[in-house]
A protein has these predicted regions:
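A short glycine-rich, Lys/Arg-flanked "PGG" loop and its adjoining helix->strand segment in the class I
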Residues: 123-135
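SAM-dependent methyltransferase
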Residues: 143-208
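Conserved beta-strand signature within the Rossmann-like core of class I S-adenosyl-L-methionine
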Residues: 136-143
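Class I SAM-dependent methyltransferase SAM/SAH-binding core
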Residues: 47-98
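C-terminal lobe and adjacent flexible extensions of AdoMet/dcAdoMet transferase-like proteins
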Residues: 206-236
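A short acidic, Gly/Pro-enriched loop at the edge of an enzyme's catalytic core
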Residues: 100-108
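Conserved class I S-adenosyl-L-methionine
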Residues: 1-45
């Protein structure tokens, strides 16, 4: 399977860390409601969320699912720097659809990854969560725009400065199917006013609205509420 994040991996943490810093307190608070059983982090990326998960649940096993080989490089580097956390984290190099999960889950985390799943794959995921999630335990996801196929003009995603160089990312999207857009994300490196490099990645993204998500969850016996930008899912 092609690795759509290969061109983004070296910049990934620089661009996305501010987002994780922003949602960290809310994620920590929700995860304190976890039940018995391992915590599954779907689409863990480079593991930016793992320290928050680990602090919220210091005794839980964590299963980190990440299919991208290039992002797993950053993930294992992070775990190497957190040896105590690494003792509790098992990394599965698969997608959510293929991952073998334990029969009881204490919590599920899936930040900025739902767009990688088709409606059929989402339905399968919700059914698996409904069958495995401990009573009262949360599954925490996020919804990203657009919520339906639409053109999105290029806009900045973020930037960071390391030494003399400035790293930035911007993206645009175009409809590419009944429930899909294709994102085109460009990463640039500048030294002052001089652009040193530019790399663009494209990936398809399945759109889903809040209403669609509520319907899907209801059919699986689940329900959702919003909390500080997070979608918190529980058993009905």
């Amino acid at each position: 399977m092609p690795d759509s994040y290969a061109g983004a991996a070296e910049h990934f943490d620089l661009i996305t860390k501010p987002y994780w810093s922003a949602i960290g307190p809310a994620l920590h608070a929700v995860l304190r409601q976890a039940g018995d059983g391992p915590v599954v982090d779907i689409g863990t990326g480079t593991g930016l969320g793992l320290p928050t998960i680990g602090k919220a649940l210091p005794a839980h096993e964590i299963i980190a699912i990440e299919p991208s080989p290039s992002l797993r490089i950053g993930l294992f580097s992070r775990l190497a720097d957190h040896p105590e956390l690494a003792k509790r984290v098992t990394v599965l190099p698969t997608g959510a659809q293929e991952a073998e999960l334990p029969p009881r889950l204490g919590a599920v985390v899936g930040i900025n990854m739902l767009g990688h799943l088709s409606p059929a794959d989402r339905a399968t995921l919700w059914n698996r969560i409904a069958a495995s999630l401990a009573p009262g335990a949360p599954a925490v996801f996020t919804l990203q725009p657009p919520d339906r196929p639409a053109s999105i003009p290029e806009s900045p995603f973020g930037e960071a400065v390391v030494g003399r160089l400035r790293y930035s990312a911007s993206g645009s999207a175009e409809p590419s199917g009944e429930h899909q857009v294709t994102w085109r994300v460009t990463y640039r490196v500048h030294d002052g006013a001089t652009q040193l490099s530019e790399q663009t990645m494209e990936h398809c993204w399945w759109t889903v609205s809040e209403g669609q998500l509520d319907d899907e969850l209801h059919r699986a016996g689940l329900a959702a509420s919003s909390r500080d930008g997070l979608v918190v899912i529980h058993q009905q």
